[in-house]
Amino acid sequence: MEPILLQTSEADAGTRLDACLARAIEDLTRSAAAKAVEDGRVLVNGKAPNKSYKLTGHEQIEFTPEEPAPIDAVPQDIPLDVVYEDDDVIVVNKPSGLVVHPAPGHPDGTLVNTLLYHCGDSLSGVGGALRPGIVHRIDRDTSGLIIAAKNDYAHQFLSAQLADHTLARTYECIVVGNLREDSGTVDAPIARDSRDRKRMAVVPGGRRAVTHWEVIARYPGYTHVRCRLETGRTHQIRVHMAYLGHPILGDTVYGAKKAVPGLTGQCLHAVGLQFIHPRTKDLVSLTCPLPDEFTAMLRKIDR
């Protein structure tokens, strides 16, 4: 596989090499990083370091990923909350903690596996063998509505709506702190964080990202917010809320690192989905209720 090149800075000085790699490379654990060093798949300034090497800053690291084991998306009988289904599309309410499609870090137990069990062969092949039917994604620790296509025509029709921003997606979240205004728009470009490849960040020259938001309710130290995506970048709402200085409650990547008791993920739920049906051309508007964890947190912060 092609090596990944990383450049360290003074801020990395004193950090163990394996810890730096695990922080910087998506889906790489610290133990896997240490093994890569032992296997000779990591070079620092062109030389093989020992596994306890500590960075001094301003090094160039070359990391060669291990060849991944083949992944085969297989049907698995996992509970599926179907909100809408016909011959062309299926919309489900994804729980927090469920990954959308197989990848090296999670080869099974995903939404794709359960869709294959539920739908059989009637999923579009446009997304490839590991993403059959998947038109868009939501993060593992985000819950709510996600649509999948049952044939290639439906997939292409829905993808076109996604591209021209007519497939409307609405989210609700709880953010830390009190937003000054009652509504607003964040128009700030997003790209991968150069310091940590697992994170996204607002970066000049990144891909355009637009989030419209409005306050639903205010609580001491928290705000219940509705967000509408105009674009759909990776981690967009999470990045934009943190950019405003109000990270989403429970988001350990862009907010406080400590998990919130009672939450399995962040308080972010895809509550609404609106699209033109690929076959009938009718407008379909769907909603789903907030998960129990979310409503329990609203009660808790209202005390």
At which residue positions do the language-model features occur?
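Short alpha-helix capping/helix-loop boundary micro-motifs
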Residues: 45-50, 221-224, 259
